[in-house]
């Protein structure tokens, strides 16, 4: 697939200005030049042209926001001055696997003031004596050359773009944790409500027991009252019998007195 068609497919019905990343690896470039890429990609930040048969970058449009450019496994042997002219904010440049032989071919990169990382793996220039010292001296703005700084300390795996992605992932995890904490809080509140309901049930049962106790006590009092009434009735009957007995006794005494007369 040629480069023009690949760019058309990568757009996916978007306008060039809406594209921030463009990967054209392994497509075919006619005459070893960039084709189909225009200055309309004003917001492009990442461009990958790995193994597309490039010989020159002379057709590269001006991309003011481009930060990372992948040009590994091509046949570029010079003409890097176009990079400084067209890509003023470039920070990462990968030229591994190209035909760069001399330190002098890298001189145009001095104008890339924002350049922090340069990769030249598998280029003949890396075989020169004092290669690393010479490149760092030529390009003092560099922080990392072939993945290591001046003190041979390895570069971190993540660059600014990857860090941004990591921050988004951390935010999502934080939201999930907050959501889990909220759910736990809701469960605790629900448990507290259940405990309150149980306490209310226990109190209700105790109240019922108290009422039942009062009823029983009242019932016993009623029984005691009935017994008292029975005793009172018995006493009344006894008094009546005694009075009847006394009346009969008086009557007999009166009758006896009459007979004596």
UniProtKB/Swiss-Prot annotation:
| Gene expressing this chain | ANP32B
Q: What does this protein do?
A: Multifunctional protein that is involved in the regulation of many processes including cell proliferation, apoptosis, cell cycle progression or transcription. Regulates the proliferation of neuronal stem cells, differentiation of leukemic cells and progression from G1 to S phase of the cell cycle. As negative regulator of caspase-3-dependent apoptosis, may act as an antagonist of ANP32A in regulating tissue homeostasis. Exhibits histone chaperone properties, able to recruit histones to certain promoters, thus regulating the transcription of specific genes.
Origin organism of this chain?
Bos taurus (Bovine)
Q: What do we know about how this protein assembles, alone or with others?
A: Interacts with histones H3 and H4. Interacts with KLF5; this interaction induces promoter region-specific histone incorporation and inhibition of histone acetylation by ANP32B.
Q: What is the protein's given name? A: Acidic leucine-rich nuclear phosphoprotein 32 family member B
Q: Where primarily located?
A: nucleus
Q: Which GO terms describe its cellular component?
A: cytoplasm; endoplasmic reticulum; nucleus; perinuclear region of cytoplasm
Acidic residues bias (residue ranges) = 157-243
Which terms does the UniProt entry file under GO BP? nucleocytoplasmic transport; regulation of apoptotic process
Pfam name, any one: LRR_9
